[in-house]
Amino acid sequence: MSRRRRAVKREILPDPKFGDIVITRFMNALMYDGKKSVAEGIVYGALDVLKKRGGNQADPVRMFHEALDNVKPAVEVRSRRVGGATYQVPVEVRADRRQALAIRWIIDASRKRGEHTMEERLSNELLDAVHNRGSAVKKREDTHRMAEANKAFSHYRW
């Protein structure tokens, strides 16, 4: 067990445009070198593109949350050493980690895409995630497949 105290969760303020805390978390994860205004511009630009693509009555925040929900993993594998052998043990993912992983995977998948601007890449990745395709969704499927393949070791859970 850790001897240190549990770290206090910092309160994150909702973003100024939509009033959504998850979007702020997304911006913070996207940000490089403390350049929040750049990250803000990218996210808001991508959400504007989502609004245009989905028709004017489409709600970009709802689409964003739908994309995030489609990428969130339910289970993952963790390494566990038992008697000299290392087993990949499937474990259920906590809600806060689920969200963090989904955000990270969407950003990583966006950065690896081939479009010119980050705004385009992010909007296309979010759109793909809404339709259950794209690299981020594939990452979730692979994680679930690994957990399914190692289901036999689930009794080693901790």
Swiss-Prot record:
Gene3D superfamilies: Ribosomal protein S7 domain. GO terms for biological process: translation. Signal peptide: none annotated. One of its GO terms (molecular function) is structural constituent of ribosome. One of the primary rRNA binding proteins, it binds directly to 16S rRNA where it nucleates assembly of the head domain of the 30S subunit. Is located at the subunit interface close to the decoding center, probably blocks exit of the E-site tRNA. It comes from Granulibacter bethesdensis (strain ATCC BAA-1260 / CGDNIH1). Pfam families: Ribosomal_S7. Disulfide bonds: none annotated. InterPro entries: Ribosomal_uS7 (IPR000235), Ribosomal_uS7_bac/org-type (IPR005717), Ribosomal_uS7_CS (IPR020606), Ribosomal_uS7_dom (IPR023798), Ribosomal_uS7_dom_sf (IPR036823). The gene is rpsG. GO terms for cellular component: small ribosomal subunit. Part of the 30S ribosomal subunit. Contacts proteins S9 and S11. This is Small ribosomal subunit protein uS7. The keyword Ribonucleoprotein applies. Keywords: Ribonucleoprotein, Ribosomal protein, RNA-binding, rRNA-binding, tRNA-binding. Belongs to the universal ribosomal protein uS7 family. SUPFAM superfamilies: Ribosomal protein S7.
